[in-house]
Curated annotation (Swiss-Prot):
The keyword Nucleotidyltransferase applies. GO terms for molecular function: chromatin binding; DNA replication origin binding; DNA-directed DNA polymerase activity; nucleotide binding; single-stranded DNA binding; zinc ion binding. Belongs to the DNA polymerase type-B family. CDD domains: DNA_polB_alpha_exo, POLBc_alpha. SMART domains: POLBc. One of its GO terms (cellular component) is alpha DNA polymerase:primase complex. It comes from Sterkiella nova (Ciliate). This is DNA polymerase alpha catalytic subunit. Zn(2+) 2 binds at residues 1375, 1380, 1393, 1398. A motif (CysB motif) lies at residues 1375-1398.
Length: 1492
């Protein structure tokens, strides 16, 4: 046997053993080795230690680490950090006892001085700008580390641009003063040193170090007395003093001849500490606001442990559980959602069942088979009318129709069979079919066969109804399903193989009749709680200029109530975070994530991993609700785009229906799918409900802004900081900042959940769905028209009506339908583009009497005006006689359009008449539905009065609100063009009746009660009570309420608001102080209300918004007018002085505007300053991807060259980025004149336009402008004082009912100068009351009572009329812009102002309308007959006009005015011009007559 002997070779030593002396030599050699080439010892250096020594320092914690840190000088690290490495090497060599260090050759003092002098001479020979800061890179890094946290651009601008700009003269004066101070402080040793030299800088640097050490000692002594400030002091010494020491180059550049004294350095340190204190206070305030959030996170941290489990462990195998059947073999199923696929061939119902094994509700889906399509065919009439046909003739007609239909079926081989039979149905809609009962042929065939085209025509039938009806809609209507409810499922079959959904349980039903609505459920009586996942995301921009998901935080709540408020305090949360491309993560981020106990954070290297984890979490949690703010406005589209781009597997787990391919159609509402179910977010999430709090807030509350920050503030009383995705990379510098970002994202998700709960979105939309009978997901999408449509479909289906088909939309109509919510009733404009002119007039707007009212104004409003009109006059499709508007193919009838004046088509709607309101027709569906809703709401409100349980009271409040919303929106489906129940004739009739009702109310208020109506809009009026007593004003409102309400049965007006004071500017624009709780005197309080005054637009700078807000607050303050004027004078003067002195910070002038397309696509940038700035930034090296779709900040400036200032007229030449202004060093300064004239004066002018005692001239003078330019506007307002000029512009009270409608037009009043006493007065008319209760003739002077001679009066009137004619033919036009006021009689094109830069319109100063109004006014002054007709008192006294004093004189004066009126072409209506086209010899080129 051979043995193998193993020979082991002697191994080499892995570690080398040396003694202490040799190890110290190695360490010293490391310290002396400059391992950075050409660094000269100023950069990095090796401390000589080992790697494990540094690691131990990092990981060492507890008392041992603290003890080690206290053994050395606390300033040593700072000194070592700031001093060059060469200096540290010298210190180390001098202190070391290493012999090798002492063996180096010594350099004498003289040699050292020579070397240093040579170095300094070389440095002094260079210009200061050529010298580089050796610590520049380190300085930039420290600045980045210590930059204050900014979540949005506004905070970033405030941090960067919260500086005061100095003018060039101020800089020069400051430098001269500093040079004198420097010369006085320069010592003898430094008298020959160049102030720009490095030696000088080194001396200053070392002095700063000494001062910083002294400051360190002082701060330590302070910290002993105030332990709470220790952390702040350490922060100040450890960070900001570094910045002071490092930034020596910048200090020298700004102050070239300054020597930093100890006092100045101490002042600088004090200033820095003050800034730190302010920053710390702000941080403490923010932490105080977030205390509730942090406590909640800590409380819910234990629930997050479930989310840390393995994915497979979290998902148990629920599908193996048996179905929880009832004793009778049925299944109790709670309906939540439904969806159809393959054109209705596959119908899925989603809901929840109670799984006993799990002791909770789990998701379940039902695949419904056996659906049938139903079509109704209308036979064609020939000869006889339907009413005259006999039964046999109807049968023969039906037989012929069925024979032809069989031939039609054979043309479609996919439809193998169907069944037909004649039935009787009703019709009452817009096709040319007589309203009433008719015979139809009903067709039924299996839903797996394709649908029949609705355009099929035949010889024996007119059209086919129901061809494009979706199977889901048919299922809902036939099974009478009205929203989420319990169902009883008979014969359920559990699906185990080839499952089509991701639900925990899946069943199959062979016949839809096996599904029935049940009220008494055998399994569970309460409604199942819903599970919600509320998420918020943070995005970043990729190098390809695409949005990517960087962070995603979710709040999971498994107990969302369907009937009332939910308990959302208890929840789970998790955050998914990934690394940014090209951006390193902070040090030890993984351990920091693991140690974060109050949050569950998962980190991923790539976006793909993050999204896959999110999809997996959705599948595991199986939520019923997916909640986010602005979810449907781009967030979900982004998520799906990234899923498609990254090819995420099992992406359909976001929903509950299994799919292979992501749908690529944006929307397809023209198809048969219910509710436009081809919308992509709906396609991928069917089975789950999408809750977008942005959309629901727009539906449920009225706010000026619907972003999360504003809604959290006004609805939740919570502060939120806006976040700008462009600043996302700045948070990846430190873990503290990254945790702030994570916390911000998690809090966004929680605020969204709070908002959903506060607005009661889930219970309210459920009630709306239960009332209307539509799908819940459509109610969550604010499909108001669809809710009303489904409600009417249920009602008309119940009454055996043939339902109108869904309109087939083309691409153009589809685009309109997507923005259907932007349409207004009776208005022809949309946000998305143009459409035909308004088909009918909308609500009436009474012209406002603009001005400031310092007494109580009452706002009275009709309760649900349009629904009440429908009930009051019994308006319905079946009661209003109207002509048909559509052909059988669904197209509009041609007679619906006529040519307008501009050649465009206008809809010509027949004015329908009101039906007989005393006739009660049983088929009047609209009034019946509204009446039923009103009765239900009344019953709910009566129950609320006696209910004491807060939970039940909240549920009742939600139900009554849902009923109110449904009733108020019922009118909308009539005027909505895409609605199946579109009936413009009925809608026009309702709005016309509404206008008549408002006018009737106005007439009662003014003529019967003598009230002053100052404004009215659609269903409300404002009344000036003339009183400051609240109870007295309310009594006036009650009087009007009683007079109006007694005229109607259903219409009712109520006091809706009481304004203590009102600033009424124009239509839909006012501000007021409003009484709240005015019916309860003990609880009355005054709040400010604004409508239409938009002060948040980005094209107004912060200074403009601040000034406008102050002016408005002063006007509404209730102070005396003199005090308001003094306050405004002081405030505006201070603003003007600050602008002149340049003490306003730069961020107050910043205007932002978005770049919406590629910069090269902008053709003309002269009037677009943001584009000019963006173009300049692009030329400076910024990529276009960083500019497009971003908001560009800019300020308007003027350039300064020496003593001259260059100011261009083009805004593009005057616009600068804030960074450019700062770096210009005084060469570019703010153009204060532009800001005053463009940003400050216009908004102030609009606010004070109707305030007496405050003129534009006064405001311009306060702001430092030339008041002469604005004197015209002041004179234009003060026209009440008579002058020698007989033409005085004013608003006289006209004398006839016809002319009363003209009282808002300016006319020229007749002014008479008495020939006896030379007194000027307005001619008063026929008779005027005197002080002793006697009547005086208008031909007597109001002062001396002397009779005016007839010849003098006639001559004065003749001169007045000639001057009036001369003013008209002068053709003067004036600009309507307040700051322009240009007048000219030049011939203008498009009536645009001729002043360069002004965008105002030029209007005629004396137009034809104004001249005609003046003539009619004058004719009324001398018309005795008209005077007696209008004045009953004088009519009784003077039985005949001839008995009135001076009758002949007035008659002659009237003839003179009538002679001018006859000459006026404007006063005539030439019927020949109007109807001349009907005559054969008509001349189409007749010239228009002149006014005179």
């Amino acid at each position: 046997m051979i043995k193998h002997i193993l020979q082991v070779e002697e191994t080499k030593k892995i570690f080398e053993e040396i003694d202490d002396n040799e190890y110290e030599k190695i360490q010293d050699s490391r310290k002396n080795d400059d391992f950075i080439v050409d660094d000269d010892g100023y950069g990095y250096r090796d401390h000589g230690g080992e790697i494990w020594d540094r690691d131990g320092d990092v990981e060492e914690v507890g008392k041992k680490k603290k003890k080690k840190q206290n053994n050395h000088d606390p300033n040593e690290n700072i000194m070592n950090y700031m001093m060059p490495a060469s200096t540290l090497k010298k210190k180390s060599n001098a202190a070391s006892t290493n012999p090798s260090a002492q063996q180096k050759p010594k350099v004498s003092v003289e040699q050292s001085r020579d070397i240093m002098n040579n170095l300094f001479q070389q440095l002094d020979a260079k210009d200061v700008d050529e010298l580089e800061d050796v610590n520049e890179a380190k300085n930039m890094f420290v600045q980045e580390m210590n930059r204050p946290v900014a979540f949005n651009k506004e905070e970033d601008f405030n941090n960067r641009y919260s500086v005061t700009l100095e003018s060039r003269e101020e800089q020069e004066r400051r430098r001269q003063s500093e040079q004198l101070k420097q010369q006085a402080n320069i010592g003898q040793n430094q008298s020959d040193v160049n102030p720009f030299s490095k030696k000088r800088k080194l001396d200053e640097f070392q002095q700063v170090q000494a001062n910083s050490y002294q400051s360190k000692q002082n701060s330590h002594s302070v910290s002993k007395s105030k332990p709470g400030d220790h952390e702040m002091a350490n922060h100040a010494d450890g960070v900001d003093l570094n910045l002071l020491a490092i930034d020596d180059t910048k200090m020298t550049d700004s102050h070239p001849s300054e020597i930093i004294t100890q006092n100045q350095r101490a002042s600088a340190v004090s200033s820095v500490n003050q800034q730190i204190m302010e920053s710390t206070n702000g941080k403490n305030q923010l932490e105080k606001n977030d205390t509730e959030w942090q406590q909640m996170k800590e409380k819910n941290a234990v629930f997050n442990q479930d989310l840390r489990m393995n994915d497979n462990a979290l998902m148990s195998n629920q599908q193996d559980y048996p179905l929880p059947l009832n004793e009778d073999g049925t299944l109790s199923f709670y309906w939540i959602d439904a969806h159809e696929e393959n054109n209705g061939a596959d119908l899925f119902v989603f809901g929840k069942i109670y799984q006993h094994e799990e002791r909770k509700f789990v998701s379940c889906s039902i695949k419904v088979n056996g659906m049938q399509r139903e079509l109704f065919v209308l036979p064609k009439m020939s000869g006889k009318s339907r009413a005259a046909m006999t039964t046999e003739e109807e049968k023969e007609q039906a037989r012929k129709v069925m024979m032809e239909l069989e031939g039609v079926r054979k043309r479609f081989p996919a439809i193998t069979k169907w069944r037909c039979k004649p039935v009787t149905r009703k019709y009452a809609f817009e096709l040319p079919i007589q309203h009433g009962e008719h015979q139809f042929v009903k067709i039924k065939y299996d839903a797996t066969f394709p649908s029949l085209p609705s355009t099929v025509q035949g010889n024996t039938f007119e059209c086919i109804f129901g061809a494009n009806q979706s199977m889901l809609e048919s299922f809902i209507l036939k099974r009478k399903i009205r929203g989420p409810c319990w169902m009883t499922i008979r014969n359920p079959q559990k699906v185990t193989d080839f499952r089509r959904t991701w639900c925990k349980q899946e069943i199959l039903v062979s016949n839809p009749k096996d599904i029935e609505i049940t009220l008494d459920d055998l399994n569970k009586t309460e409604l199942p709680p819903l599970t919600s996942v509320t998420f918020a995301i943070k995005t970043c921009r990729s190098s390809q200029n695409t949005n990517e998901i960087a962070m995603l935080s979710c709040i999971v709540n498994e107990n969302i109530s369907q009937e009332g408020p939910s308990k959302i305090d208890v929840h789970k949360s998790f955050t998914l975070l990934r690394k940014l491309d090209g951006k390193p993560m902070p040090i030890e981020y993984e351990r920091a994530f693991r140690d974060k106990k109050d949050s569950f954070i998962q980190f991923f290297q790539h976006e793909r991993q993050l999204i896959e984890a999110f999809v997996a979490k959705i599948y595991q949690l199986d939520p019923d609700l997916m909640v986010a703010h602005n979810l449907c406005g781009g967030m979900f589209d982004l998520l799906l785009a990234r899923i498609q781009m990254l090819k995420i597997s099992h992406w359909s787990r976001i929903g509950r229906l299994k799919k292979n391919q992501i749908p690529n159609k944006k929307s397809d509402q023209s198809g048969a799918n219910y509710g436009g179910s081809q919308w992509i977010p709906r396609q991928v999430t069917c089975g789950r409900l999408l809750v977008d709090t942005f959309l629901t807030a727009k539906e449920l509350i009225r706010e000026t802004n619907y972003d999360l920050t504003h809604l959290a503030k006004v609805q939740l009383q919570k502060d939120r900081i806006d976040f700008d995705d462009d600043l996302l990379p700045t948070f990846y510098v430190q873990m503290a900042k990254l945790f702030q970002l994570i916390d911000h994202t998690e809090k966004d998700a929680y605020l969204t959940l709070q908002l959903m709960n506060h607005l009661q979105v889930i219970p309210l939309t459920k009630q709306l769905t239960n009332i209307a009978g539509n799908l819940w997901f459509r109610s969550l999408q604010n499909a108001r028209a669809e809710r009303n449509e489904m409600l009417l479909l249920h009602e008309f289906k119940k009454k055996k009506f043939v339902l109108p088909d869904k309109k087939q939309l083309n691409a153009k109509d589809l685009k309109k339908n997507m923005f259907a919510d932007e349409y207004e009733e009776g208005d022809g404009k949309t946000k998305g583009g143009k459409r035909k002119k308004a088909a009918y007039a909308g609500g009436l707007v009474i012209e406002p009497k603009a001005g400031f009212y310092d007494n109580i104004i009452l706002l009275l409003d009709f309760n649900s005006l349009y629904p009440s009109i429908i009930q009051e006059y019994n308006l319905c499709f079946t009661t209003v006689n109207r002509r048909p508007t559509k052909n059988f193919d669904g197209s509009e009838m041609k007679n619906q359009y006529k040519k307008g004046e501009n050649g465009e088509e206008e809809v010509d709607i027949e004015e329908a008449d009101l039906p007989d309101k005393n006739v009660n027709l049983k088929d009047a569906v609209l009034p019946m539905v509204l009446r039923d809703l009103v009765q239900k709401r009344k019953a709910v409100k009566d129950k609320m009065k006696t209910e004491k349980d807060h939970v039940k009271l909240s549920q009742l409040e939600i139900r009554q609100k849902a009923i109110k919303l449904t009733a108020n929106s019922m009118y909308g489906c009539l005027g909505f063009g895409s609605s199946r129940f579109h009936a413009q004739a009925i809608a026009a009739l309702i709005t016309r009746t509404g206008r008549e009702t408002l006018l009737r109310t106005k007439d009662i208020a003014e003529n019967k009660l003598g009230f002053n109506v100052v404004y009215g809009d659609t269903d409300s009026i404002m009344i000036n009570t003339g009183s400051n007593q609240l109870q007295q004003a309310l009594e006036m409102g009650k009087r009007l309420k009683g007079e109006v309400n007694c005229l109607y049965k259903c219409l009712e007006i109520e006091i809706d608001g009481v304004f203590k004071s009102l600033l009424l500017l124009k239509k839909k624009k006012y501000a007021a102080l409003k009484y709240e709780n005015f019916l309860s005197p003990a609880e009355v309080k005054v709040v400010q209300e604004m409508k239409g005054l938009d002060m948040v637009r980005r094209d107004w700078c912060p200074l403009s918004k601040r000034v406008g807000r102050y002016v408005l607050d002063q006007i509404l303050s209730g102070k005396q007018r003199e005090e308001v004027v003094l306050n405004l004078n002081e405030f505006l003067s201070n603003i003007g002085n600050e602008l002149k002195e340049g003490t306003i910070k730069l961020n107050e002038f910043i205007i932002t505007k978005q770049i919406t397309k590629a910069i090269s696509d902008y053709n003309d940038i002269k009037g677009q300053p943001h584009v000019a700035v963006a173009k300049r930034l692009r030329d400076q090296g910024k990529s276009e991807n960083q500019l497009v779709n971003n908001f560009i900040p800019y300020v308007i400036c003027q350039q300064t060259y020496g003593d001259t200032t260059k100011s261009s007229t083009a805004l593009s030449d005057k616009a600068y980025h804030p960074d450019e202004v700062i770096s210009s060093r005084g060469k570019v300064t703010i153009d204060s004149d532009w800001y005053v004239s463009t940003q400050l004066l216009p908004p102030i002018t609009r606010l004070i336009e109707h305030i007496e005692g405050i003129e534009v001239e006064f405001v311009a003078q306060c702001l430092g402008l030339d008041p002469k330019k604005y004197r015209y506007h002041s004179e234009k307002k003060n026209t009440d004082n008579p002058t020698d000029d007989p033409l005085i512009v004013s608003n006289p009270v006209l004398q006839t009912e016809t002319e009363r409608s003209l009282k808002n037009r300016t006319v020229a009043e007749l002014n008479i100068k008495c020939p006896h006493c030379a007194h000027n007065y307005h001619f008063p008319g026929i008779l005027v009351p005197s002080s002793n209760n006697t009547e005086l003739t208008g031909l007597a002077c109001v002062k001396c009572n002397q009779r005016i001679p007839d010849a003098y009066m006639l001559n004065r009137l003749n001169l007045f009329l000639k001057q009036l004619t001369a003013l008209y033919y002068l053709g003067m036009k004036e600009c309507k812009e307040p700051q322009c006021g240009m007048k000219t009689n030049q011939l203008l094109l498009n009536n645009k102002c001729i002043v360069k830069g002004c965008k105002g319109k030029m209007n005629s100063e004396y137009s034809e309308l104004r001249i005609n109004d003046t003539l009619r006014y004058l004719e009324g002054l001398f018309n005795v007959k008209k005077f007696l007709i209008e004045n009953e008192k004088y009519r009784k006294k003077y039985e005949k006009p001839e008995l009135v004093p001076n009758f002949q004189s007035f008659k002659e004066l009237q003839k003179k005015v009538e002679s001018f009126m006859i000459r006026s072409g404007y006063n005539k209506v030439d019927l020949g011009n109007i109807f001349g086209f009907m005559s054969k010899g008509a001349n189409p080129h007749q010239q228009k007559m002149s006014i005179f």
